[in-house]
Regions:
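N-terminal, active-site-proximal structural segment of metallo-dependent hydrolase catalytic domains
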Residues: 5, 15-79, 279
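Structural recognition of the beta-strand scaffold that forms the well-ordered cores
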Residues: 24-27, 55-59, 86-87, 93-94, ...
Length: 284
């Protein structure tokens, strides 16, 4: 939804199993390829140069004016002395310091309501599969407790405080379908002994951030909500990397939305200007 990035270091075992390899993985929502802010595209380039991630997952790739965003980015990063590999895509994207062996669509884009792609690399003898996901932005149900409609973002007469109603609205999106497509596809990759990573803008909070310890803050209105997508992934054995490092959601909320930019009007930065809609919706 808005330009935001989350950078984490993943540790993977190499083929010899006695050594460990650190990979810096970046999830980056680029807010319509940076076009929403003056010189935003070059801000994207600058951030990548500064952070120097090994693997990047992008959300909101648009290929405006028929220009491939990934190809343009690879060219401009090379001018800055950084070699990255990437293949053309839309909605979601992947860049890597390692040559991409293959890339394919896992969940196709339809009516701009989310998509998933995956790419495979070989790193020090290990095959790694990276999924880049930008999940459905409609029925954004975490706005309901804040008193805003999650499709129109208009203020409602009163907040929704019934968990079953919130989760029913959440399931009306395609987010759970998109995550189940990842899980089903990734099981086949794991059966082949490949390491699987997922990065994306989920447009949905983690259930780990909506338990008893946070029910009375951030306009959670006393509710514990087991949000679908994060629960599906954790039940299939995946780890929420930020929560692995920072397990306390009260002290370390890890908000990725909304973000602040002094050059942009507040109304363009947040969907609910009269509510506390801070959430962690970008994940690795």
């Amino acid at each position: 939804m808005r330009s935001v990035f989350i950078l984490l270091v993943a540790v993977v075992m190499t083929a010899c199993q006695s050594s460990r390899k650190e990979l810096k993985v970046l999830q980056f929502n680029i807010w319509q390829e940076g076009t929403s802010v003056e010189n935003g595209y070059w801000g994207i380039v600058d951030n990548i140069v500064e952070l120097s991630p090994d693997l990047i997952t992008f959300s909101e790739v648009r290929n405006y004016n028929g220009i491939s965003f990934i190809s343009r980015l690879v060219t401009d990063l090379e001018k800055r002395g950084m070699r990255y590999y990437g293949k053309e895509s839309v909605s979601t994207g992947i860049l890597s310091k390692y040559e991409i062996q293959s890339q394919e669509v896992v969940f196709p884009l339809k009516n701009d309501r989310g998509s998933v792609i995956k790419a495979m690399f070989q790193i020090e003898g290990e095959e790694i599969v990276l999924y880049s996901a930008h999940l459905d932005w409609m029925n954004c149900s975490y706005y309901l407790p804040r008193g805003y409609d999650g499709c129109t973002w208009k203020k409602m007469k009163q907040p929704v405080v019934d968990v079953d109603s919130i989760l029913a609205d959440n399931k009306a999106s395609f987010r759970d379908d998109e995550v189940r497509a990842i899980v089903e596809d990734a099981r086949k990759e794991r059966e082949h002994g490949r390491i699987v990573m997922i990065g994306g803008d989920f447009n949905e909070p983690s259930h780990l951030d909506w338990q008893a310890d946070t029910k009375d803050i951030r306009e959670h209105r006393g509710m514990v909500v087991n949000w679908d997508c994060s629960k599906i992934l954790i039940e299939d054995g995946y780890k929420d990397t930020f929560r692995e490092i920072y397990p306390n959601p009260v002290i370390y909320p890890g908000f990725t939305f909304p973000t602040n930019n002094i050059e942009v009007d507040l109304k363009k930065l947040t969907w609910a200007p009269e509510a506390d809609d801070r959430e962690r919706i970008d994940f690795i």
